[in-house]
Amino acid sequence: PTEPINSGNGMINNDFLTNTYVDANLRSNHIDAGVRFEYMQQPMPGFEPNFRGWGVPYGYVKYHDKKLEATAGTFYEQFGSGFILRTYEERSLGIDNSLLGAKVVLKPIEGVQLKALSGVQRTYWRWEKNIIYGADLEIGLEQFIKRMKEHNTYLTLGASWVHKHEKEELIMVDATHKLNLPAGVNAMDFRARLQTGGLNILAAYAVKGQDPNYDNKYIYKQGNVAMLSASYSQKGLSALIQAKRSDNMTFCSQRKVHGTAAY
């Protein structure tokens, strides 16, 4: 552009606007490593003001074999349907809420997978001081019930736990009263998925403790979400029906955060 434009984060008078990503990755039989350089000093129109910047916010080293995967550095993860933990990158929306820390994935026997992680979350160009801990367990019952496998039926049970520990901060409700904020908040997720032939059914439920935050206007109330999804597909035909109910289930690593990149 040759004329000043409103990019969504203020008027910009630059001849060159860019969101640039440069990835470098090395892979071997058991060890992977990678880094990513990002340049958004003059970002494309439509991105939030805090999106502007440049640097190397992403880097990792990973060891993996048939039963173990261990990652140190930055990584993305999702437990179940993502009700209590979902970190991901969506460049077209300006979202990258990766975790900086460590993650371990264990597969001790066929049909069992256990994940454990700890880290701090990225928000725009900074790493928050609040710490996230999490664990996830999935069991494929068809690996232990021979008749299920013989009839092409698969049943996966899953459970997740996430804890966020936030630093103490002062939030006033008026000139003389402050909020008594919890230092830690726990959340749990339970789910079951049944697949047989072209039928796929998923039921999931998650609950979290009292979590006063910007999104719920700092109320003291537990949150919960439930979802039931059913789909069927065969050649020339597919159908999907889904029901979901959510109550006070915003769950962010920092209580005062808002904006697109927070989610």
Go through each PLM region and give its residues:
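Acidic, small-polar-rich N-terminal luminal/periplasmic segments of exported/outer-membrane proteins
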Residues: 40, 54, 58, 75-81, ...
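Signature for the C-terminal beta-barrel architecture of outer-membrane proteins
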Residues: 3-17, 26-27, 31-33, 37-53, ...
